[in-house]
Structures are given as structure tokens and as C-alpha cells.
Amino acid sequence: MRLIYVSMEDCKRTVFPYIHKNLTSNEMAPVYETDTQGMSDLGKILQFVMNDDYYPTFSDKTSYLLCSLAGAQYFVNGNKRVGVVVILRFLEINNVHLSALTEQQFQTILSIAFPAHAWEHNRHIRNPHAAFLYNLAIVIGDKARWGTNDFSQLKERVAALFEHSYFVE
């Protein structure tokens, strides 16, 4: 399957507006486009994920995107939200099918991979998959919940979670 990648234009046209419209009721998001360094760093991530030598599988690519974006401080605020929405966009433009799991099943999967994390319910997130990504982004953003200090091991764990969650045609 030939993958379609999220571009900077996608971020400006789709990702950032989605965040501002739907994910700012509890905490404001910055105007991402005005952060020159953050936008530059985001662009590098979006380019590097295309490298099949480093990220040969869909799960590897998805893991790299989420871990790199949610686990960094490229922007003053909203890095986890950018990571989650970029992943959702990546899934959407590639017509990826999700495992039909309940929120409880996603909780169980996440607790096995990251036992130090207690599932956080967000009343604004009703979709089980979105709740899973939200909680996974929280784990990635907090090294104390990883169970390791090794970023490569974190990416491998996240890739394994994604292998069982997404079906690429």
C-alpha cells in the first residue's frame, strides 16, 4: 500500500482548525502557525516519517509520529493534541480501519503496556479510540509512566499497540 502522509498544509488546513474548534474547552491552544521554531520542528517530523529505512511499517510510522509530537515541547502548549490529531488525520487519509474495541478494552491494552498509567476520563472525548489516543499521549508526555527511559523502547511499545489496533489495506 502506498501511504499518503500528513503535510504542513494538512496541519494548517485541517489539524490546527480541528484542535481550535474541538479541543480547547478545558485549555486554550496556541496559534501554532505563528511559532516559527515549532512549525519547523513539526515539518521535520512530517518529513522524516516518510523514511522507510527507519520506519518501514505503518505501525512504526504511526508510533514515531505520536511519540515525537506528543512527547516533545515543540510548541508552548498543545503538543499532545497535535500528536493525537495528526495521527487521526494520518489514519483518515489512508482509510485505515480500526479494531472494534470498547473503551474498557482499550484501557486494558494500555494498562498492560504501561501499568504506571491510570486511565483518565475526559468528558469531551466520547469515542473509545480517541480516548485511547488521548491517554496514550498522556503516557508519552510523562516519562515517569513509560517504565523506561529509552525513547526507542517507548516507540516499540507504542508500535506494538498500533499493530493490534489498526488494519491497513
Roles of regions detected by a PLM:
Residues 1-169:
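FIC/Doc superfamily catalytic core
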